[in-house]
Each structure stands twice: as structure tokens, then as C-alpha cells.
UniProtKB/Swiss-Prot annotation:
InterPro entries given in the database record: UPF0637, UPF0637_domain_sf
Pfam families in the record: DUF1054 (PF06335)
Name listed for the protein in its UniProt record: UPF0637 protein SaurJH9_1166
Family of the protein in this entry: Belongs to the UPF0637 family.
Organismal lineage: Bacteria, Bacillati, Bacillota, Bacilli, Bacillales
Recorded superkingdom: Bacteria
Organism: Staphylococcus aureus (strain JH9)
Length: 204
């Protein structure tokens, strides 16, 4: 019995038709692990940064028709929410588990906060080859950093700084069949390794 990780069948919750039925599937197959991950990693971030972090598991409460295509737990230093702050995420689409750190378009002082990625441009380029960027958290697309030109990356960061709807996340993503999802131990190790790479961008 696993506590934190996800099986390939859990991702099939996103194939369930209809809002109510899909929410039931998410509640059964995915949200329990997200809550456990929320407890574990809010303590992890609090320990690593010296600031108190709070977990926020997606509720999808505003939806009335369209079922969610993704779900997540986010970590930020506010009890009230995470969208207005730089934050960490663990989440899922039907074809991927993703891990991210960055700034959403709704963030307060977004232009100032997003400049961390401008300052640490070289550090982004030096992330391992399987690290990616996400420029729209609502879409599954996450190009590999190694596949972007310097100009592509600079333009993406500038968009997050200067355009109202712009956002920028550094990310990592794995498939539902990935061996790092086979056990809690392997999954937690993967997540901690990823967040260790992200933390210097938070504290910069």
C-alpha cells in the first residue's frame, strides 16, 4: 500500500466523462495522495527555508460544467492562497506528473518577482537536461530548457515580467509509467531532488 505515489490507473481519472463523475474519480484516486504530499512537503519547505509553508490542494470549486483536465497541490507561505505568490507545485494531467516552481500571472508584484529568473538566467541554463519550462500552467506543454535558444528563454522571461497574462515556471515532468512512481521511496526521492534544484530560485 502506497501513501504518496500514483499508479498508471490513477491518471485515468482524467478520462472519466462529466464534471461530477470526474470529481468523484479525483477524490478517490488522486486527492488522498495530494493531501499526504501536502503535509510532507509543507514541512520540507518550512525546514529548508525557515519560512512557514502551507499546502493548497486544488478544489476546482468554481467549475460548474467542464471537468478539470489537471489537478495539483501547491505550496506557498500564505494560508489564504498561493496564486499571488511564488510557489511550488506537484500536479497531474492525464499523461504526466509535473513538478514546478514559478510565478503565475495573478501574482502580486509579478514584474518584480519574475526578475529572479532574469537574474538567475545562467542557473536555469545549467539545470539538468530533463528540466523544462512551463509558460502557461493551464496547458500540459512544457518544452525542455535544453531545446530552447537563449533568445527563446529570455523572451519567455521578459513576457512573464512585462505582459499581464505572462507567467514562468521551471518544471520537471514524468509519464504515468515512469519507474520513479513505482514506490513511495523513489517518488519522494525524485520530488526532493527536484525541489532541491528549485529552491535557489525561491531564495534568490
Amino acid at each position: 500500500m502506497t501513501k504518496y505515489t500514483f499508479k498508471p490507473k490513477d491518471f485515468k481519472a482524467f478520462n472519466v466523462e462529466g464534471l461530477d463523475a470526474r470529481m468523484e474519480a479525483l477524490n478517490e484516486y488522486i486527492r488522498p495522495q495530494l493531501h499526504e504530499l501536502g503535509e510532507y512537503f509543507s514541512d520540507f519547505f518550512t525546514s529548508q527555508t525557515g519560512e512557514t509553508f502551507y499546502p493548497h490542494v486544488a478544489k476546482h470549486a468554481r467549475r460548474s460544467v467542464n471537468p478539470p483536465k489537471d489537478t495539483w497541490v501547491a505550496f506557498a507561505t500564505s494560508k489564504r492562497g498561493y496564486k499571488m505568490l511564488p510557489h511550488f507545485q506537484i500536479g497531474m494531467f492525464e499523461d504526466q506528473l509535473f513538478v514546478m516552481f514559478g510565478i503565475m500571472h495573478e501574482a502580486k508584484d509579478k514584474a518584480t518577482r519574475a526578475k529572479v529568473f532574469e537574474r538567475k538566467f545562467k542557473a536555469i541554463q545549467q539545470l539538468p537536461d530533463d528540466y523544462r519550462v512551463c509558460l502557461d500552467h493551464m496547458k500540459p506543454d512544457k518544452p525542455f530548457i535544453k531545446d530552447l535558444t537563449d533568445d527563446d528563454l529570455k523572451e519567455a522571461i521578459q513576457r512573464a515580467i512585462n505582459v499581464k497574462k505572462g507567467e514562468f515556471f521551471i518544471a520537471r515532468a514524468i509519464t504515468p509509467q515512469d519507474k520513479r512512481l513505482k514506490s513511495d521511496k523513489a517518488f519522494i526521492a525524485f520530488l526532493e531532488e527536484t525541489f532541491d534544484q528549485f529552491l535557489p530560485f525561491y531564495s534568490a
